[in-house]
Amino acid sequence: MKIIVIGSINVDYIGTTEYELMFGESHPGSIHIQAGGVARNIVENLARVKEDVTFVTAVGNDFYGQKYKSDLEELGVKIIMPKKTEQYNSSIYLAINDKEGQMVYSVVNTDIVSLINKEYISSIIDTINTFDYVLIDTNLDNDTIDYLFEKVNKPIICDAVSTIKADKLRKHLNKIYILK
C-alpha cells in the first residue's frame, strides 16, 4: 500500500508551568522543543510500522526544519518539497500548558505551508494520483484543498487539525474516505 501525506512539519515549543496561570504574568516552568505537525506525526507513525509513505511538505532552511526532515528520511520517508526558499522559517507551534499539563493556549505560524499551494500541487498531481491513499491536513489553504478534492482520484483521508480549520472540509464531507 502506497500512501502520500500532504501537510506540515512543525517545530513544537511546549511550555508547562507548575503554577496557576495568571494573565499578564511570567510563570516558571519547563519548555520542551520537539518535532510536530499533524501530518508529520502521521508520517512518522506510518514509517515506523513500515508503510510505504511519501510526504509533501515544506520546511525552512533553519536547524529544526532540516533536522526533522532528515529524521523522517532516515526512517525511509520519501519527501517531496517545493523549491527551497529563504522567505519563511519552518512552521512553529507554541503551546502553553497549565499545571495539569492541559493546553490552555496555543499559537501556530504555518506561513511556509503557503508554498504547498494549488499551483504547486497541480505540478505534482499526476504523481499524487499514483498512490493508493492521499492524506491531507487542514493547514493547507482552501483553494489547495478544493483542488485536491477535484483532481485526486484516490481515497482522501483528512485530519481536520483543529475546530477552526475543520470548516475547510465541510463542503467535501461526501468525498472524504476517513475523517479525523
Regions found by a protein language model. Name each.
Residues 86-88:
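Short, glycine-/polar-rich solvent-exposed loops and beta-turns at beta-strand/coil boundaries
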Residues 1-9, 71-84, 96-180:
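Ribokinase/PfkB-type carbohydrate-kinase core domain
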Residues 90-95:
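Short alpha-helix plus adjacent loop in nuclease-associated cores
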Residues 1-58, 63-77:
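Glycine-rich phosphate/adenosyl-contacting loop at the front of the ribokinase-like
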